[in-house]
Amino acid sequence: MEIHSRRAIKDDIRGIGKVHVDSWKTTYKGIFADEFLENITYEQREKQWENIFQQEDKSKYRFVAETSDETIIGFIDGGVERSGAYNCDGELYAIYLLQEYQGMKIGQKLFQSLLSACINNDMQSLLVWVVTNNPSKNFYEKFNPEKIDTKFLERVQVEETAYCWRDINNIIM
């Protein structure tokens, strides 16, 4: 099965929204409340992504992974670090991959695309917030980031951990 990655475009919103919902429901089962996950809809996520794409600027880097029949099976979203609090240039905002495609190095391909975009735009470091109980945090940890913070999100009752790669040129895939 051939999977390739490319820059995301507005026409990808429906596919990105579907991956976002489906991957949340599998990734966060048992971490977020069932009721919370059950109430996430494709329509909500599509609207969220429409808003994100409307705010498009040159400091945002978005890529999708798709099958040979152009079905989107994953995405990554990143850009300039949003808080300014962690002395990091860039931030990985989100990366999601449908469960059946995990473990096939597709996430690494997406991550490499984001890293290349950041490096090409003179960024040296990258921040990511990860739900602490998310087993997928191992994906980030294998690239040896520095753990720099934690915070508790009251609204959804979960803890997040912030990781930073201080020199993204040294991340080895």
Report the location of each language-model feature.
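Acetyl-CoA-dependent GNAT
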Residues: 7-11, 21-31, 37-100, 111-113, ...
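Conserved hydrophobic beta-strand within the GNAT/NAT acetyltransferase core sheet
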Residues: 92-95, 126-130
